[in-house]
Amino acid sequence: MTKTYTKAKEMAELVGTQGWMDDALSSKDELKAENGRPGPFGLVAGLNEEHDSIEEEEEEEDDGEKPKRRGPKKKKMTKARLERFRARRVKANARERTRMHGLNDALDNLRRVMPCYSKTQKLSKIETLRLARNYIWALSEVLETGQTPEGKSFVEMLCKGLSQPTSNLVAGCLQLGPQTLFLEKHEEKTPGCESAISSHSFTYQSPGLPSPPYGSMETHLLHLKPPAFKSLVDASFGNPPDCTTPPYEGPLTPPLSISGNFSLKQDGSPDLDKPYAFMAHYPSVSLAGAHGHPTHFQNAVPRYEIPIDMSYESYPHHVAGPQLNAIFNE
């Protein structure tokens, strides 16, 4: 009886252990099945991955639709390319240099055919072109109207639109004298003196003075003042204005006196021996010509007699001679 009891007890334990093993195996299978089935979070992750892939595909399509970048593509700078660039630059510089040399030579040839060519005063490019235009215009007017190219209108055409130094150069080279141009400008500025200046034409030449290319405008204005003053005085006093000033012959030498055994004295003019009243009332031609003033200008100046305080008695020469000899003999 005891054996059976023990066998039955062992059998029950064996059955219990087998059931426990079956339960364990079934639990493992359930875990595998649960891992194989996607949960709710797994579905959300899968949807996000699909959305990201779709967006990447759309971006790739958009990149393909954009226009390509224009312009030269940047290439790597090599020694060969640098040499080509340098050679191209040298050729361009040589071409520009040749062009400028040709332009300068053409302008020099144009300056030589102009009426006021000067080696010392070189006209600028713009002044050369303006003078050439005025020269062509003036020559065409001369051919059409038949006027001489030595009048004032010809000079006005040449100097139109030019600077003052260029106008002086033109007037000096044409030997027309800048005083006529100055008078015309002065008439425009001062219309009150128009009648006095325009009614008298004067020619005043100053020998030994520089020509307009080498002199300044102030020197020409300075030389214009004496004839203008003379013409105005002539007009006011009613004297004929056809008198010209003689050329300057140098300053008069003063009388020399050397204290010693001999003395040198310049021969005086016979007019100097005459009294002052006689000279003032009746000036001689020699004195007026020696000082460079015409006689009519001396007559036009008002006369003033200088009073002498001391008493002056005039003795005849035949009486003064014996008296002086008697004084020296004593």
Swiss-Prot record:
UniProt-listed PROSITE patterns: BHLH
Tissue specificity annotation: Expressed in both the developing central nervous system and peripheral nervous system.
GO biological process: amacrine cell differentiation; axon development; camera-type eye development; positive regulation of cell differentiation; positive regulation of transcription by RNA polymerase II
Record's keyword annotation contains Transcription: yes
Leucine-zipper as annotated region, ranges: 162-183
An annotated GO cellular component: nucleus
Compositionally biased residues, Basic residues: 67-79
Top-level taxonomic group: Eukaryota
Keyword line: Activator, Developmental protein, Differentiation, DNA-binding, Neurogenesis, Nucleus, Phosphoprotein, Transcription, Transcription regulation
Biased composition (Basic and acidic residues): 25-35
Gene Ontology MF terms in the entry: DNA-binding transcription factor activity, RNA polymerase II-specific; E-box binding; protein dimerization activity
Motif placement: Nuclear localization signal: 73-79
PTM section of the record: Serine or threonine phosphorylation within the basic region may regulate neurogenic activity.
Region span, Disordered: 1-79
Keyword Nucleus annotated: yes
Subcellular location as annotated: Nucleus
Role: Probably acts as a transcriptional activator. Mediates neuronal differentiation. Required for the regulation of amacrine cell fate specification in the retina.
Name of the featured protein: Neurogenic differentiation factor 4
Organism (species): Gallus gallus (Chicken)
